[in-house]
Amino acid sequence: MATNHIVPFVKASVSIFRDMLDLEVRSGETEEEGDAFVSRGFTVIIGFTGGWKGRFFLDMGGETALHIASSLTGESYSTFAEEEVLLSGAELGNIISGNAITDINNNNPGLNLRLTPPSVFTGEGLTMFNVRLSSCSVLLQTDAGPVKINVAVEEGNK
């Protein structure tokens, strides 16, 4: 996978964390992940299709998910299994991926990427495999805790 595919997702994540959640963000380096990804405990997955196929992971630990959900809703939560925490994570993933895909489509006329609905998985150490697809990650350090952005893309015909 070309490492430049992750850039719009990182830019969108940094912007949303700063503007919407009022969190300071420091971005790490892009790293090749290969075909396996291990969850920190709370993972939002959003696929995309069109001229390219792929998926976006927004991954964080449970405490980070609780902090972010509280920032979004103004409520406090005791477990990341609460429905509002799951919905907040899904919505945050939707906003970030929507901004990233809009940026990609605007810079690649005719690509016409579209998003799938988000899914949220919980459980520390879950390993997810990309069949015949490698991915790249960037670790963001936020005031709420570390958040990993992971993107896998297979380019097709425009």
Q: For each predicted feature, which ranges?
A:
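N-terminal auxiliary interaction/assembly segments of multi-subunit proteins
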Residues: M1-K158
